[in-house]
C-alpha cells in the first residue's frame, strides 16, 4: 500500500479510537474503517511494521485483542503535511489537514527562501489562482506581472526608472514618422526548445492589431533576416514603449494549437511555467534565456483563498517564525475609483454624480472603514497621488433617487469592503445600493450596464505613457465615457496631449471619481537582495537573490 494511503488510514483509525489504546476485535476495527476483516488485519500488520502501533491478537471466540498506539495521529499528520509542503502538493495538504486556519499557519511557516538540492526556491502566499496568463487578453495586476516573467517583447521598460531598454530587439530606429525598424537578436529560444523565428514575431504583433492602441499598425514585414519593419497609419512617438507592453509580448506562432496555453503559456522569458493549478503556480528559471539567467531558481506561488478576507496590503514572502521585516512599501500609482456609466439614466445624471461624489467622498469611506483598512488607505483626490483634481462640494440629494446599482469584478476582497461601506452610507440617506459581482472578463468588456462601477487602476512607469495607455485599452471605460477616444489617442501618440488636464476633465465631470490610494507592502527576509517593489506591488524575480549566511 502506498505510504500516503497508509498514513491516511492510520490517522483515521487513531481519530476513531480517540487516540486511546484499547481491547477490541478485528470486526470492530474493520467496521470503523469500512473495510473487510482480512484487509483490516493487513493494515494492522503493516502499521505495526512501521512502528506506529502494536497489535496483540488473541485467538478464540469472545476474546479481545489489544491495540496500543505508539504514534499519535497528529504527529503522523504533521509529518505527512511536511512532506506535502516540501513536494508543493498544496491541494492534498488542504484535504489532509482540513482546518483552514491550520493550513494557513503551515503555509506561512514555509514561506520565503528554501534551499533544496542546490536550488534557491522562493515561496509566496497569494489569495487567488493565476490561471490566465495570455498576453493580449484581460489581465489583472498580478497576472500582468507574472506574464512579464514568462514572456519577452521587442523592448522592455525598466520597472525602477521607467526607461526603455532592449529586449528581443537590440536596436531600433525611426526611419520616418510612419516607419520604424527593429533589429532582433538571433538565437532566442522558446521554453519548449524551438528557436524564435521572424514569423513568430510578425504573427504575435498582427494578432493584437484589433486592440485600440495597436490598431494604427498598417503592416509588419521582415526585409532582411532579423530585421523588422513596422509601418503605421499615423505617427506614434510611443511605439517603442508600446511594443514593450504585455499585449505585444512574443508567442510561438502555433500557440493556439498548444494545450491550455492561457494557463501554461510558452514564452522566451526568464521563467517557464512548470505547474499552474487552482492551488499553485510554479515557475522555474529558464536556463536558455537569452539574457542574464535568473538568480532564484524557482518561484512557487501558493494559493490560499482564505487570506482574501484580510486587508490586501502586502505580498508575504516570509512567515512569522523568522525575522519578518517590511522590506519595501509605497503608495500605489493609481487608485480605487468610481466610474459612472453614461448608458444608464442615473449614471448619466449630473445631479446624481455630484451627490454621490459628495456623500461617498474619500474621507467618508476612510472614516467608516475598520482600523485595519484605515492603515492602508489614503484619500484620493486624483488618479495619481500627486494630483489634487477632485473637489468635494456639498450637493443635495436628487428628488426621487431611491436606488443605485454598483458593479465590480469578483475575487477582490477590498471591492466588497468598499462596496459595503458605500451601502451603509447610502442607506443612511434612504438610498438602496444594489451590488453585483461579475467576472473580470465581463468587467473588462463592459457590455453589461450599471449605474456605477467600482474599479481600480495601477499605472506602471513611465506614468505619462502608461496612464492613458491603461485607460484606453479597457473597453468598459470607452463604453461608459462618451468622448472621442480615437482623437485623444492620436493627440497622445503625437505628444500633443496634456495628460494632467485630460484626467482633470474626467474627474471634474465626475465620469471618474477617485476614492482611495492603497499602500503596497512587501514583507520578507533580511537575506533577500536586489528586491525593488514595482508599481504593481511585486518585484522582478530574476533580479532578486539570497545572500548566504555569514561564515
Swiss-Prot record:
Residues 1-116 form the HTH marR-type domain. The keyword Repressor applies. CDD domains: PBP2_SgrR_like (cd08507). Residues 26-49 bind DNA. It comes from the Bacteria. Residues 163-492 are annotated as: Solute-binding. One of its GO terms (molecular function) is peptide transmembrane transporter activity. InterPro entries: SBP_5, SBP_5_dom, SgrR_HTH_N, Tscrpt_reg_SgrR. GO terms for biological process: negative regulation of DNA-templated transcription; peptide transport; positive regulation of DNA-templated transcription. Coiled coil: none annotated. It holds the Pfam family SgrR_N. Keywords: Activator, DNA-binding, Repressor, Transcription, Transcription regulation. The keyword Transmembrane helix does not apply. Activates the small RNA gene sgrS under glucose-phosphate stress conditions as well as yfdZ. Represses its own transcription under both stress and non-stress conditions. Might act as a sensor of the intracellular accumulation of phosphoglucose by binding these molecules in its C-terminal solute-binding domain. NCBIfam families: PRK13626.1. PANTHER family: HTH-TYPE TRANSCRIPTIONAL REGULATOR SGRR, PERIPLASMIC BINDING COMPONENT OF ABC TRANSPORTER. This is HTH-type transcriptional regulator SgrR. It comes from Shigella boydii serotype 4 (strain Sb227).
Amino acid at each position: 500500500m502506498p505510504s500516503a494511503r497508509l498514513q491516511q488510514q492510520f490517522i483515521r483509525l487513531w481519530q476513531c479510537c480517540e487516540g486511546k489504546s484499547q481491547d477490541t476485535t478485528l470486526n470492530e476495527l474493520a467496521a470503523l474503517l469500512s473495510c473487510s476483516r482480512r484487509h483490516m488485519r493487513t493494515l494492522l500488520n503493516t502499521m505495526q511494521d512501521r512502528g506506529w502501533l502494536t497489535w496483540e491478537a488473541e485467538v478464540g471466540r469472545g476474546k479481545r485483542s489489544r491495540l496500543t498506539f505508539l504514534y499519535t495521529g497528529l504527529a503522523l499528520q504533521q509529518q505527512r503535511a511536511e512532506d506535502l509542503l516540501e513536494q508543493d502538493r498544496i491541494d492534498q495538504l488542504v484535504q489532509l489537514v482540513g482546518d483552514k486556519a491550520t493550513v494557513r499557519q503551515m503555509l506561512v511557516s514555509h514561506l520565503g527562501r528554501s534551499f533544496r538540492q542546490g536550488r534557491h526556491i522562493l515561496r509566496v502566499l497569494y489569495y487567488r489562482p493565476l490561471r490566465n496568463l495570455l498576453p493580449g487578453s484581460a489581465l489583472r495586476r498580478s497576472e500582468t506581472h507574472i506574464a512579464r516573467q514568462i514572456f519577452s517583447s521587442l523592448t522592455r521598460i525598466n520597472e525602477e526608472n521607467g526607461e526603455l531598454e532592449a529586449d528581443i530587439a537590440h536596436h531600433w530606429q525611426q526611419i520616418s514618422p510612419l516607419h520604424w525598424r527593429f533589429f532582433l537578436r538571433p538565437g532566442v529560444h522558446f521554453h519548449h526548445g524551438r528557436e524564435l523565428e521572424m514569423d513568430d514575431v510578425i504573427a504575435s504583433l498582427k494578432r493584437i492589431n484589433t486592440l485600440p492602441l495597436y490598431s494604427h499598425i498598417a503592416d509588419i514585414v521582415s526585409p532582411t533576416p532579423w530585421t523588422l519593419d513596422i509601418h503605421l497609419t499615423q505617427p506614434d512617438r510611443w511605439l517603442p514603449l508600446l511594443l514593450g507592453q504585455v499585449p505585444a509580448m512574443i508567442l510561438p506562432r502555433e500557440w493556439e494549437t498548444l494545450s491550455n496555453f492561457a494557463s501554461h503559456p510558452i514564452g522566451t522569458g526568464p521563467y517557464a511555467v512548470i505547474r499552474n493549478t487552482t492551488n499553485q503556480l510554479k515557475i522555474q528559471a529558464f536556463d536558455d534565456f537569452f539574457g542574464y539567467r535568473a538568480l532564484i531558481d524557482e518561484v512557487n506561488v501558493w494559493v490560499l483563498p482564505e487570506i482574501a478576507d484580510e486587508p490586501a496590503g502586502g505580498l508575504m514572502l516570509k512567515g512569522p517564525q523568522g525575522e519578518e521585516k517590511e522590506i519595501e512599501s509605497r503608495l500605489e500609482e493609481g487608485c480605487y475609483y468610481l466610474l459612472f456609466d453614461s448608458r444608464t439614466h442615473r449614471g448619466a445624471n449630473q445631479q446624481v454624480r455630484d451627490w454621490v461624489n459628495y456623500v461617498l467622498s474619500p474621507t467618508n469611506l476612510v472614516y467608516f472603514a475598520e482600523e485595519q483598512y484605515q492603515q492602508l488607505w489614503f484619500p484620493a483626490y486624483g488618479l495619481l497621488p500627486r494630483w489634487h483634481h477632485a473637489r468635494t462640494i456639498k450637493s443635495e440629494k436628487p428628488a426621487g433617487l431611491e436606488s443605485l446599482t454598483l458593479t465590480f469584478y469578483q475575487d477582490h476582497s477590498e471591492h466588497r469592503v468598499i462596496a459595503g461601506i458605500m451601502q451603509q452610507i447610502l442607506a443612511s440617506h434612504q438610498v438602496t445600493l444594489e451590488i453585483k459581482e461579475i467576472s473580470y472578463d465581463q468587467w473588462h468588456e463592459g457590455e453589461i450596464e450599471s449605474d456605477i462601477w467600482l474599479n481600480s487602476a495601477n499605472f506602471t512607469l513611465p506614468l505619462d505613457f502608461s496612464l492613458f495607455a491603461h485607460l484606453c485599452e479597457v473597453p468598459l471605460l470607452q463604453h461608459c465615457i462618451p468622448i472621442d477616444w480615437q482623437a485623444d489617442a492620436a493627440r497622445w501618440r503625437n505628444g500633443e496631449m496634456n495628460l494632467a488636464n485630460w484626467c482633470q476633465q474626467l474627474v471634474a465631470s465626475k465620469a471618474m471619481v477617485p476614492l482611495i490610494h492603497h499602500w503596497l507592502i512587501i514583507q520578507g527576509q533580511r537575506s533577500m537582495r536586489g528586491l525593488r517593489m514595482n508599481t504593481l506591488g511585486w518585484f522582478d524575480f530574476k533580479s532578486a537573490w539570497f545572500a548566504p549566511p555569514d561564515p
